[in-house]
Amino acid sequence: MMQSIGSYHHNNMSNHHHRDILNRKRFEIVECLNFQRTLLLNYLRSNHVFDEEDCELIMAEKANRARAGKFIDFLLMKGSEAYQHFLDVIQVENANLYESLTGDKATSRKFSVYF
């Protein structure tokens, strides 16, 4: 199925925008993510953003900050839809980080994240 030029341009701009945010806020994200809890990776797996191998490679890192850095590297390759799923779960798990990344106030819509 072919994308229209406008649709391609919008998707390309969205990809560039989320990549820019992830790169600019990388230090803050690395400091805030906690891979001791499994909600983030489980949610992204259930939404087919990450697969089992992605999660294993992230969790193979010894330190939490190394895991967070690897996570961002993987997320950068996944596209704007993956970034939106990331924001959905971060809104529940870390409201301050969500607000820093989006400029929007986090809501308590937990039901949208849980299966």
Describe these PLM feature segments.
Residues 1-115:
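Death-fold homotypic interaction modules
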